[in-house]
Amino acid sequence: NLLRERNLRTPSLLHNAPTAGNHGAALIMQYLSDGKTLTECMQNAVTSQERHSLLSLATRSIATCHRFGLRQIDVHMDNFLLSDKEVYYLDGGQIQVQGESLEEELAYDNFALFLAQFKVENDEAIGDLLHEYHLENKTCSAPVYADILRRVKRARNLRLINYEKKLLRSTTANRNIRSLDKFAVYDREIHSPLLEDFISDPNRYIVKD
């Protein structure tokens, strides 16, 4: 395990085995009863100070990965679990190793990818987060705010392009319905028989004079 080899905290792997037909694998991980992902913690945070503290935790964790030459391909708050005031790394299968420490260009692009998932109004916190990052990873030169902001904007554009592509097909988040006479996309969280009925025949729901 790339994380354990570098003494980075991660839930213990208790058992793993291939699935039938060897199309995948099943993993049984250590259960941390009080564990919450940083996404869950962020949703429960009441004050801006609490949210900033959680972003700082994630930033330092990402910087630590980079210092050890590790890069999370799809880096986001769900990759980190907070348990007993300690941060655990998750989703080790989506981590690549790039040598003893991550090259500066890759490191800052990866950090920008993380920052790009948040709303634009949160960009005012980037300066403080860059300071937190550099405290944890001094293998890179001190990051320049304008350069990181440029990378964040580029990452946001790429995220938007990828999101638009996903709208053309069904995913775990969205359902896509396409036929000769209709095209509909909706969030699976709002799925219901009533919505299905509306999509199949919307004219029945139009009030006529």
Roles of regions detected by a PLM:
Residues 51-55:
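Short alpha-helical scaffold element within the canonical Hanks-type protein kinase domain
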